[in-house]
Amino acid sequence: RDKFPVIIAGGSFNNDTHITKTRKEYCALIDTLIKKCDPDKVVFVIGASLKGYEKYLLDHAKKFEIFAFVPATISKARLHALQRCNVSIRVAIEPSSMGIYKSIAYEIFKRNASVLLALDGNSSVVNLVQEAKNAKYSCRIFVNPHCKMLKKKADSLLGYVTLLQDSNNEEDVLKYIHA
């Protein structure tokens, strides 16, 4: 049986001018997932940049398999940086990082149940949330309400998205991870 995918969107799904500021409560959520999930049953999925919550995950989830979706035209420097982090790399068909949500939708949402933690981003992560909502298999979506674009998207998908609270998110997220 395949591992259960947990997508962490929070660093790669921005334009170059936006810097993800990590919040301690969401880093604590990631810590809890690392502590309570089984590395033999869960795989984490991130984007191509080594920033924000995705970087936090890479620094702390050493026992887990982590897949990084990268655009088809990734620079050699970024590719080497990802390889040094010991992640598995999936090359998306899209040439830019703003379009990799399409490959995540195809590779994950159309093939497996999953969990999406949308912690930061712009239109690309909003599109990822929409794709998760339209998934062939169940994708439980959790959104950071402090990110204005994500909060607006969550409000438009009322009933399909869970807004993360400032604390006590761990058990709510863990009950949807099939591992």
Predicted regions and their residues:
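A charged, well-structured terminal subsegment
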Residues: D166-A179
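Acidic/glycine-enriched connector segments
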Residues: D2, G10-D166
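N-terminal intrinsically disordered, low-complexity tails enriched in polar/charged
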Residues: R1-K3, A179
